[in-house]
């Protein structure tokens, strides 16, 4: 083998090494992207589950057994009443202050925190209210050390009574 052939062989080996390194890097990056997508799907599922669960309950403790005809009948303190613990909540605002840790099989550990507030809805604007209103907003935050960001989900529940 002459000097030219040796040089060509070395260049071919370098190019092959670079190609293999590039393929491995892309495979690792794709694997990380797929893993992150799976974490986000799981986190979304956990967040929406809380919202769906809360939305299926009564609007307020005062509306569990009877109808509300004035905002003065609504609870001034949002959160679970004495003796109520998750998952045995009976109204929407019981979820206020909930912190839930979920470990999904073969996945990350997720922390879910919930805040419920009275809001005033006017057109497309939603403003937090310090006094009871016929609308409450739930904010669910799902985070994990395995994710680079926190997913935030919000929904508004309003009380409607028809005579």
Q: Where are the predicted features?
A:
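Aliphatic-rich helix starts adjacent to a transmembrane/signal segment
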Residues: 4-48
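Low-complexity, Gly/Pro-rich coil/beta segments used as flexible assembly/activation regions
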Residues: 41-163
């Amino acid at each position: 083998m002459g000097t030219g052939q040796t040089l060509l062989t070395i260049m071919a080996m370098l190019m092959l090494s670079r190609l293999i390194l590039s393929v491995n890097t892309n495979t690792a990056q794709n694997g990380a992207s797929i893993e992150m997508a799976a974490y986000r799907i799981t986190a979304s599922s956990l967040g929406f589950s809380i919202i769906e669960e809360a939305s299926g309950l009564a609007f307020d403790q005062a509306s569990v057994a009877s109808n509300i005809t004035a905002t003065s009948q609504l609870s001034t303190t949002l959160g679970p009443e004495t003796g109520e613990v998750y998952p045995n909540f009976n109204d929407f605002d019981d979820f206020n202050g909930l912190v839930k840790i979920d470990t999904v099989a073969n996945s990350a550990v997720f922390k879910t925190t919930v805040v419920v507030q009275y809001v005033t809805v006017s057109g497309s604007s939603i403003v937090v209210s310090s006094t009871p209103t016929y609308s409450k907003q739930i904010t669910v935050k799902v985070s994990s050390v395995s994710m680079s960001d926190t997913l935030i989900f919000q929904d508004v529940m309003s009380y409607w009574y028809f005579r």
